[in-house]
Each structure stands twice: as structure tokens, then as C-alpha cells.
């Protein structure tokens, strides 16, 4: 009764989406250094990604799993954490929305190894862009993404968030049933195409926050 008294005379009206300016990655690499008295440097290497309704979303999900979204199996973790010991955590992520969201690789490392870590991130981006992924990497990514899908929505809050995304991006009420087939249908050729199309380390933005006197960047 109190709710109806307070809001009962409210009427629904159509509200259009705001018009946002188009964004794109810079024509050449941009480097931003922020000097802070910290023992560890925080590094973000990123660029403009894609909107969620882009049909390449699923191929890019597989690509990101191989590059830096697959935990200990990802290339970035293997190189930067396991082989070099430069960082405890390193990961990559696409964050698509109604418009193009960011792509970013993020890590923290000692100031003294920040330059080497940046160099390795850029090298791995070039490598996956030029050489693509292997058949084994594709199979592993498909198995994980399809197998873990139900586990991502095992709470009421997660189900509510999924339903919101389904409505917002027009995925269809049958999206949960279709998702495994969308992932399994992908080929190496499709993954390698989106790697060439969407990743360009030479047009990335590199941000390094740390004690700059101890940080030697490779450019």
C-alpha cells in the first residue's frame, strides 16, 4: 500500500539510448607513465574492443581464453608467471557492451622487471596475431568454455545477471541452450582471423604506474 501510494501514479515512457561518439584505437602506440612511490608497477596494455552484439564475440572468447583468460593454461600466464616469475597474476579480457568496450592485459610486477614484462606482453600479442592458435589450444578452450558454462550461473544473482544480459543484448531466451553449440562450431581459421582483425599491439595504449626511475620500458 505504501509503495502504491508513493509510486502508483508513475507512468512508463519510452527512453532512447544516449548517442555516444565512436571510439577507435590510436593510429600508433600510446605510452602513459605515472610516477608513484611503489615497490610494484601496475601495467595495463589495451585497445578498443568490440560491441557485444558483434557476431565475432564467441571466436574472441576462445581467443582470449588461449591468450590470457584461461588461467594457468593461458600463454601469458605460462610465459610471465610460470617461466619468468615476473608476476603472480596476469590476465587478458575483452569487456564488450552496447558499444565497443575495452580489451586489456593487466598485471603487477616489480619496477625492475616492468619493462621486460611489457615487452613480453607485446610479443605474445604479436605472436598470436601472426601465428594464431593450435588445434590443441582450440580443443582445450572449447572444452572449458562449454563445460564451465553452467557453473557460471549457479546462484540467483548470477542467473539474474545472465537474464539481464540476454535482454540487453538481444541474445534470445534460448541462449543458454545454444551457447555450447556456438562455441563448438568455431574453427581455428575463425579464431586466427579474429586475432589478426582485432589485436594490434602497435596501436595499443600502454599504461605503467610505478617508480619510474626504476622502470626501463622497451620504447
Explain the meaning of each model-derived region.
Residues 18-19, 31, 62, 92, ...:
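Short beta-alpha junctions and helix-cap segments that line functional grooves
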